[in-house]
Amino acid sequence: MTSIGWDAFAGCSGLTSVTIPNSVTSIGDYAFDGCSGLTSVTIGNSVKSIGDYAFRRCSALTSVTIPNSVTSIGGRAFELCSGLTSVTIGSGVTSIGTEAFSDCRKILDVYCYAEKVPYTESGVFICLPIENATLHVPDASIDRYKVTAPWRSFGKIVALTEDETGIDELKGENGKVKTALYDLSGRRVQKGQKGVFIQNGKVMVR
């Protein structure tokens, strides 16, 4: 499986955890829209694009890490993720769509590793108290972020510290404890089979 399609898991309120493997390159529009019970999302380091409304209304998410492989974040991709307090944006992101993080009113920290300030469409951080949040960016780029909308509106803009060295990549099977996989009907599946599976009570796409 190389992509998660349009509306694939929309409205699955019982979904609590998602791991998107390194084989997936795109997350479609509305893919996880309205998954209100989703508390954990791990995005593999081959994903290049996150579609419009992809994670909208995932109100239980408290943090999200967008890996360095991603170049574009779609419009309203994380709109109304009311529990988000921390967002990490990888170094490869070049564009962020309209109102991508609108109404995420609890955001306190945004860590952006892009040395070139990403292009943003209108209202990326609209309807949240951005003046109370801190933007963490590469030291060499801090002056550019300070003069570019909407980034300049953050209450604090600081350099990433030495401890914030980068984004951990999703490890393959060699870095994981082996566990059994089951399909959505409860049948155990063979190693290497592609699809959407349940592993340790969590949904996994591969």
What annotation goes with each model-predicted range?
Residues M1-S3, S13-S26, S36-S49, S59-S72, ...:
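Structural signature of tandem-repeat unit edges
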Residues V189-Q190:
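Generic structural signal for well-ordered beta-strand positions
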